[in-house]
Amino acid sequence: MATSNLRRHLSASRLRLNRFISTSSSYHSHRRVVVTGLGMVTPLGRGVETTWRRLIDGECGIRGLTLDDLKMKSFDEETKLYTFDQLSSKVAAFVPYGSNPGEFDEALWLNSKAVANFIGYAVCAADEALRDAEWLPTEEEEKERTGVSIGGGIGSICDIVEAAQLICEKRLRRLSPFFIPKILVNMASGHVSMKYGFQGPNHAAVTACATGAHSIGDATRMIQFGDADVMVAGGTESSIDALSVAGFSRSRALSTKFNSSPQEASRPFDCDRDGFVIGEGSGVIVLEEYEHAKRRGAKIYAELCGYGMSGDAHHITQPPEDGKGAVLAMTRALRQSGLCPNQIDYVNAHATSTPIGDAVEARAIKTVFSEHATSGTLAFSSTKGATGHLLGAAGAVEAIFSILAIHHGVAPMTLNVKNPDPIFDKRFMPLTTSKKMLVRTAMSNSFGFGGTNASLLFASI
């Protein structure tokens, strides 16, 4: 009898599993995903309009690092001065604070002891994106069908340093009860979910500099597979502090040659590049199932039609010289979209201004797009010359730049390409001025330490 019941139970379980697989396949095949809202906080300013205008105009959000920027408030002056002196890189891309238009108002967004900067940036960007999408649901069912997928690269290192100092000073009882929830990367998603009552998937990718792209791509699949109808997705970061800058400096990842001329330090694809400029900020988009967006008359910026991922399986920080991981990510995004390489109008390159990484990505773009790239037909650029490298937020912010390129018909420029890398020639060359053009399709690349790669492909609709 027991055996018979077990067989019936297993048979029923298999039937339910088969139905689930069938349903999931159906969702993946038929549920299209579109972008209906945008929000950002960047070194170029708070808000999409301010950031985009300054980007297209060729402005730069990078400045020199100061002693106060190290976030060492509990340390004595001698230690602060010693630490600052030891840092080989003294440039960074900061979010502009203030109460004026285009500035980040900490009184509005950092008004709780439980909120670290990276969380505040994400909530601010999400608020702009949701208002842009006109999606602030009040019905319980709509909230249950709305999720959040906002990742981060590091969390709040400065809060960890301050907490460790309490141990050194034998003052552990002064440790804030908010310490743990303040530093956890997933708390950016958590705070957005709580603020708006969203009860769909609550997710946070942590994949170094590919985080923002993975968070958006994962959110797209959640909609495709029916887990949600709307997802608030993106990345956030605030890691300009003594320990983070020291750590990246020790790994020889940061620019050190342009401390006296900060706005020239981030120079993707240029021969004089010597490392990236650390930045901060957040980019968040509202993703929505296409029919759901149409029914409510939502403004649609673009469709997210391709998401490709890969692993280098090569080195902890450097890509392989042949760029195979980047090639696989771009190729897989193209395959999912059903588009051919010569149908892509613009590529927002990951290029961070590192000697190896930029050349490898340029080589990968030539491999994937072939004559379409080498003939000069394909437009491509790296926007990190203007923003610096926003680490976990980079993929999301640059996805927004790609979407805006489609929306406004302008491909943004690459700053500081004065002496192009030898891999380029007269036709195969990154944009050095913003270009008005018809952009029907745009790809955004994001690659991270550990050999993690992601490419997002957007198309007009």
Curated annotation (Swiss-Prot):
Miscellaneous notes:
Mitochondrial protein lipoylation in leaves does not exclusively depend on the lipoate biosynthesis by KAS and may occur independently of this pathway in roots.
Q: Which reaction does it catalyse?
A: a fatty acyl-[ACP] + malonyl-[ACP] + H(+) = a 3-oxoacyl-[ACP] + holo-[ACP] + CO2; butanoyl-[ACP] + malonyl-[ACP] + H(+) = 3-oxohexanoyl-[ACP] + holo-[ACP] + CO2; hexanoyl-[ACP] + malonyl-[ACP] + H(+) = 3-oxooctanoyl-[ACP] + holo-[ACP] + CO2; octanoyl-[ACP] + malonyl-[ACP] + H(+) = 3-oxodecanoyl-[ACP] + holo-[ACP] + CO2
State the name under which the record lists this protein. 3-oxoacyl-[acyl-carrier-protein] synthase, mitochondrial
The record's active-site residues are C209, H350, H389
**Any one Gene Ontology molecular-function term assigned to this protein's record:** 3-oxoacyl-[acyl-carrier-protein] synthase activity
Database matches in InterPro entries: 3-oxoacyl-ACP_synth-2 (IPR017568), Beta-ketoacyl_synthase (IPR000794), Ketoacyl_synth_AS (IPR018201), Ketoacyl_synth_C (IPR014031), Ketoacyl_synth_N (IPR014030), PKS_Beta-ketoAc_synthase_dom (IPR020841), Thiolase-like (IPR016039)
Per the record, the similarity remark reads: Belongs to the thiolase-like superfamily. Beta-ketoacyl-ACP synthases family.
Main subcellular localisation: mitochondrion
Write the lineage as a comma-separated list. Eukaryota, Viridiplantae, Streptophyta, Embryophyta, Tracheophyta
Q: Does the keyword Transit peptide apply?
A: yes
Species name: Arabidopsis thaliana
The GO cellular component terms are: mitochondrion
